[in-house]
């Protein structure tokens, strides 16, 4: 058994174990929720299907999606500080979701659609501006779009007339899994799978970039086409998760770091490991909020930032050699 297989197996088993603990601990031994035949009553089924399963599923899906997107962006730009929202997709999904939440009373499925459209539109704007000017221009354009959309969000919040709506928007912006719904989760799953397929399709491009874009071109890879497909996939992953959770940072940044430290493999070989680590980190963060009194009043986006920032600084300071060999 290879090191990669051993690590991925261990991470998968850890996810199963912790997910099982979360379900059991939430339910407890509610014997009074069973009928005389020992069958689950409607109340216990509701706790499982309307609360625990959607929340755990959203933690796993969001953590894995952000980690996969982060690994792709760090490989594409050959920069360990690249995040999933570098090209504006995160800000676009956030701005669209905030606008919809404030002005329209719509089901979460339509909020999801708006977030995906916002992520894709902002990414396409950045891409069209900088596609002929190289990665530096692409990053700067993404930064400009992120700042513009961030200002638009701040302007909307500062002019909000409803205190209740303003409070809800602030809660959403801090990131949480409390809005998890099974139907929305199932709708977002195909979008995530399409994004993963885009990145799988361009995995060879990602590996060849470690030797430079010119090398990728000489090996029969179309850099511009592959760049667009891979970054489009990242935008789909980001757009499918942010409307459901709000802003959750650092998962897409530190999960690929952990994967590289543990495996030291090619970027395309780190996708699965990064996904498992990202899912595990977000699930543990959610459990900490639910069961540790110290974190009970902290939103998950705040907690991931509080933990992720020191972890990132530690990793950057302790690594004495280049992350990409």
Range-by-range predicted roles:
Residues 1-325:
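Alpha-helical transmembrane segments in inner-membrane proteins
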């Amino acid at each position: 058994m290879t090191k990669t297989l051993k690590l991925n197996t261990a991470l998968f088993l850890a996810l199963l174990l912790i997910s099982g603990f979360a379900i059991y601990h939430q339910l407890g031994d509610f014997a009074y929720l069973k009928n005389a035949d020992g069958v689950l009553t409607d109340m216990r089924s509701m706790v499982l299907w309307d609360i625990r399963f959607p929340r755990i599923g959203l933690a796993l899906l969001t953590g894995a999606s952000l980690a996969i997107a982060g690994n792709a962006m760090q490989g594409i730009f050959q920069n360990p500080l690249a995040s999933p929202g570098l090209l504006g997709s995160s800000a676009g999904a956030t701005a669209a979701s905030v606008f919809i939440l404030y002005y329209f009373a719509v089901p979460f499925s339509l909020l999801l659609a708006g977030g995906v459209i916002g992520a894709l539109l902002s990414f396409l704007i950045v891409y069209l501006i900088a596609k002929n000017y190289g990665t530096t221009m692409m990053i700067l354009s993404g930064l400009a779009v992120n700042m513009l959309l961030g200002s638009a969000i701040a302007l909307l919040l500062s002019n909000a007339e409803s205190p209740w709506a303003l409070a809800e928007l602030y809660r959403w912006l801090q990131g949480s899994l409390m809005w998890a719904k099974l139907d929305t989760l199932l709708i977002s799953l195909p979008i995530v799978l399409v994004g993963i397929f885009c990145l799988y399709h361009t995995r060879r491009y990602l590996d060849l970039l470690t030797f430079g874009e010119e090398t990728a071109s000489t090996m029969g890879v179309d850099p511009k086409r592959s760049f667009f497909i891979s970054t489009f996939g990242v935008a789909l992953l980001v757009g499918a998760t942010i409307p459901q959770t709000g802003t959750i940072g650092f998962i897409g940044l530190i999960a690929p770091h952990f994967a590289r430290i543990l495996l030291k493999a090619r970027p395309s070989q780190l996708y699965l490991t990064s996904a498992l680590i990202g899912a595990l980190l977000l699930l543990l963060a959610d459990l900490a909020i639910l069961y540790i009194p110290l974190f009970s009043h902290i939103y998950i986006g705040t907690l991931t930032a509080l933990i992720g920032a020191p972890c990132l600084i530690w990793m950057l300071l302790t690594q004495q050699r280049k992350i990409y060999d």
